[in-house]
Design a protein with these regions (language model features):
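C-terminal/domain-edge helix-coil "capping" segments
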Residues: 17-35, 128-196
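A structural "domain/chain start" motif
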Residues: 5, 17-72, 190-196
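Sec-dependent bacterial lipoprotein signal peptides
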Residues: 1-17
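Sec/Tat-exported extracytoplasmic proteins
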Residues: 65-76, 90, 94, 147, ...
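Surface-exposed short loop/turn segments
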Residues: 89-148
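Solvent-exposed loop/turn segments at secondary-structure junctions
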Residues: 50-51, 92-95, 159-160
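Acidic helix-start/capping segments at beta-turn-to-alpha-helix junctions
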Residues: 77-97, 196
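Envelope-exposed proteins and targeting segments
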Residues: 39-41, 72, 82-86, 135-140, ...
Length: 196
């Protein structure tokens, strides 16, 4: 009976040892010379020129940016007929944090005395799971005048979260980053803020 109680208890203890990481979103924005043109009219959303096109979940970020722009007062349209264009760039990397120490440790001890001597050996096994992978994401958005190509606004966001959090999906990460990027739009030019 005791064995059946201890097994779930041990599993709970191990589950509690799993580390989670969720950073705030670091946001920097730059406002161009014509801020009155921002937040209104038709705008198209597309990948930035030269942006890596291999990100499988790029569409989630593009959709999150489009939704954020619509909330600001833009009318998001397809094609090249819009007066402004939002160019989106995304880079995601996965890293596995290193363990603080090895999973197995060995200790040796010895003793001598008037009644003899003795040697002891100890073996320790770390049963905690390895730390989860951490996804680091960088997203940049540049709003340009379609005709001239002039930059009206630029924003950059950085965010990290371990794969065992709700932000493991690209969609959740994209919405969190877009919400932070457009928070208090257009923002103070050159200022970096952190959004939780």
């Amino acid at each position: 009976m005791t064995r059946f109680i201890l097994a779930p208890l041990a599993a709970l203890m191990l589950a509690g040892c799993t580390q989670t990481i969720v950073s705030p979103v670091s946001v920097t924005r730059f406002v161009g010379a014509q801020p009155a043109r921002l937040g209104q009219g038709p705008i198209a959303v597309r990948p930035a020129p030269g942006a890596p096109g291999t990100l499988a979940d790029f569409e989630a970020f593009q959709d999150a940016v489009a939704a954020g722009l619509a909330r600001l007062g833009y009318r998001v349209v397809a094609g090249d007929s819009a007066a402004q264009v939002a160019e989106v760039r995304v880079l995601r990397t996965l890293e596995r944090p290193a363990r603080g120490r090895g999973p197995v440790s060995v200790g040796v001890g010895g003793e001598t005395g008037s009644y003899g001597s003795g040697v002891g050996l100890g073996l320790g096994i770390d049963l905690t799971p390895p730390p989860p992978e951490v996804a680091s994401t960088q997203m940049g958005v540049v709003i340009r005048d379609t005709a001239s190509g002039q930059s009206l606004w630029e924003g950059r966001a950085e965010f990290s979260a371990s794969r065992n959090t709700p932000y493991a999906s690209a969609q959740a990460t994209a919405h969190k980053m877009a919400d932070a990027l457009f928070s208090g739009f257009p923002g103070r030019s050159g200022e970096t803020i952190e959004v939780k």
